[in-house]
């Protein structure tokens, strides 16, 4: 069996332990966050990324911007929906920077993104 990627480990822990346990968020909020990452994985699959090989460094600021554009163009999402998705990505990468301090700069580049 292949070893899981750092992204797979982080997103699994984030959705199952951190949001539900440590943050005690509602099931609907957790579902919204999960849906964001389902869409991100779909987008990355369309970009010919192998889902089981995605690493944290593969999700950079440029990719997030392309993802948000894809949501608008391909899925017809409004600016407010895109902001919800960006907020979920920001929250995840704030979590990642504490779990993987070596990723701090990478995470800060993503959490600095805003929609114009």
Predicted feature descriptions by range:
Residues 1-8:
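Acidic, low-complexity proline/glycine-rich segments
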Residues 13-28, 34, 38-116:
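N-terminal core-binding DNA-recognition domain of tyrosine recombinases/integrases
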